[in-house]
Amino acid sequence: MKETSAKKLLLKNAKIYDGSAAPAFTGDVLVEGDRILEVAPSIAADDDFEVTDLHGLSLAPGFIDAHSHNDWFALRKDSGKYFAPFIKQGITTFVSGNCGLSATGFAD
């Protein structure tokens, strides 16, 4: 696991959908680098935390696009420009090969 010196980000007062089908709840999320460290109804902020108040906003895990043909873009050298709009919409994962074939292949 790589070491990170990223400042901890505390997201406060968000309406949190955790992906479990449980009802949303208002709470806080503590993030460091690319890791979620804690999710709780309330997390006390340390002096070194960057704090963002999300009151009135919702927070959810990344969405999975289960039917997409974006695997064809993955082969392009400039693929980032094709995937960036999906990331802005909250889509972090694509299922490829869902029509019986894929441009990118599969790992064992």
Predicted regions and their residues:
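Divalent-metal coordination cores built from histidine and acidic residues
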Residues: 78-108
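Short active-site-adjacent helix-start/loop capping segments
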Residues: 46, 72-74, 102-106
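Short glycine-rich, polar/acidic loop-and-turn segments at beta strand-coil junctions
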Residues: 35, 43, 68-70, 98-100
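Hydrophobic alpha-helical membrane-insertion segments
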Residues: 27, 74-76, 99
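Di-metal (Zn2+ and/or Mg2+/Mn2+) metal-binding site signature of metallo-dependent hydrolases
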Residues: 57-82
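Histidine-rich, glycine-flanked metal-binding segment
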Residues: 2-9, 16-62
